[in-house]
Amino acid sequence: MIELKEVVKEYRTKNKEVLAVDHVNLSIRAGSIYGVIGFSGAGKSTLIRMFNHLEAPTSGEVIIDGDHIGQLSKNGLRAKRQKVNMIFQHFNLLWSRTVLKNIMFPLEIAGVPRRRAKQKALELVELVGLKGREKAYPSELSGGQKQRVGIARALANDPTVLLCDEATSALDPQTTDEILDLLLKIREQQNLTIVLITHEMHVIRRICDEVAVMESGKVIEHGPVTQVFENPQHTVTKRFVKEDLNDDFETSLTELEPLEKDAYIVRLVFAGSTTTEPIVSSLSTAYDIKINILEANIKNTKNGTVGFLVLHIPYISSVDFGKFEKELIERQVKMEVLRHG
């Protein structure tokens, strides 16, 4: 379990004070994958660096597995950091060392005997899918392979928490998915708690159980990924979801001709089993109305499926529209009116 209580990080310069993290409270379940998303400057990198005390909070508490990180002795903090390890956007590999020796490096620092360190490193090479590349140098590896080395190295001391600082930002989409699949596999095999920060909703949707959205140092929205994706509340969250959906339909609305009286354009959001139900056809039949599908999209999250439909209803009375809306609520389908004639 990881808890952040009223965590603040303030930087003082000659001319001003910058509040990078502003009274953040989070609770992260052991064994879960927790995502923190935000645009550049939101404070997410500063936040994650306080988990292992690479940055000390100005105030507030960071508690991991019952240990108050800021209250640990130097030796206690050193030991804790071996259990709260980190992977980085730009890999941070030692270019003069081979794959195997990069992975052995933290074991050497920890004083693990060479034979045991080599055996552990070989096991990790296999775990991350680099068997046969043990003697290669970082300059001979692709970006995805370098990140696999970074992950293996971070796992060398058997951590309980893995921190991922924009770990896929430098990778192409296919390699990103491969690294995300690897993180899922590692979490399942080693029961790790993974905390990752990103500016890509795709990453959050793909592997995270829960998400926190940051803006200007504050957590502005948080909760289970499917719930946040299905029903984003804050403008920033809505923007991330739209970008993931490649949804610019609301912009296109301004180019449409005015709707006739009693016509509607609505967006429906489905989750779980409702994504496979023939809701549109059944409602069309029930209310004897014509429904045009203007846009459709389905996205998979780690814990379920979310579907989106934009519909044009040329005519429906206000009474029937009220019944239509009520039936959607009963079917656990969310509706947003985009335009009304």
Swiss-Prot record:
Sites where the protein binds ATP: 38-45
Domain ABC transporter: 2-241
Superkingdom as given in the UniProt entry: Bacteria
Compartmental location: Cell membrane
Pfam family, one: ABC_tran
InterPro entries: AAA+_ATPase (IPR003593), ABC_transporter-like_ATP-bd (IPR003439), ABC_transporter-like_CS (IPR017871), ACT-like_dom_sf (IPR045865), MetN_ABC (IPR041701), MetN_ABC_transporter-like (IPR050086), NIL_domain (IPR018449), P-loop_NTPase (IPR027417)
Function: Part of the ABC transporter complex MetNIQ involved in methionine import. Responsible for energy coupling to the transport system.
Protein known as: Methionine import ATP-binding protein MetN 2
Gene assigned in the entry: metN2
